[in-house]
C-alpha cells in the first residue's frame, strides 16, 4: 500500500474494483460523490454539442475524481469519467469530504495541490488536442498517460490504454488512430496488444 493522506479519510468499506472502460460518472449526472483512486487510472472526456470529444482530465493512483470537480460547467458540453484500466476506488459524499478536508490544514493543502495538478494536466491535454496533426494528438495523449500514471507493474511500458477509448480521448477516427499506432510501433514508441496500446518507457 502506498502512503497517502486520503487513506485515513475515505472509508475502507467503500472500496470497490471497477473494470476498464467503466464510467465513474456520465454526462449530466448529478453525482455528489468524490472518488479516491487507490489503484488504476481514470480519464475525463468532454464531448461538445457537435459530438467532438477529447480528454480534459487524467488521474492516476492517489488522485481525487468527482463530477463536481469536472473541468467544465457549460451547458453545451458534457464530461464523462471512465476507467482506463482495472481501477480500485474509494468514495464518500462531497459534503463529508469537504468537512473532513477543510478542517485539517494538511488535508486542505493536499487538496489544493490536487486541484493545481488537475489544472496543469487539463491545460496540457488542451494543448495536445489542439494540434493540427492527428498523429500529434495520439502521441501527446499516450505520453501524458505515461507521465501521469507511470509504468505498469513490469516497469517497461505504461498502463494499457484501450484502443476504443483512445479514439474518444483524442477525437480521432479509428482508422487514423490505427494507422498512426502502426507507425509508432515501427519506431519503437508504443507496444500494441490485441485491443490496447502501451507507451514504451
What are these regions (language model features)?
Residues 124-148:
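Short alpha-helical segments that sit at the start of domains
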Residues 145-201:
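Phosphate-/nucleic-acid-contacting segments
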Residues 11, 57-116, 120:
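Cyclic-nucleotide recognition modules
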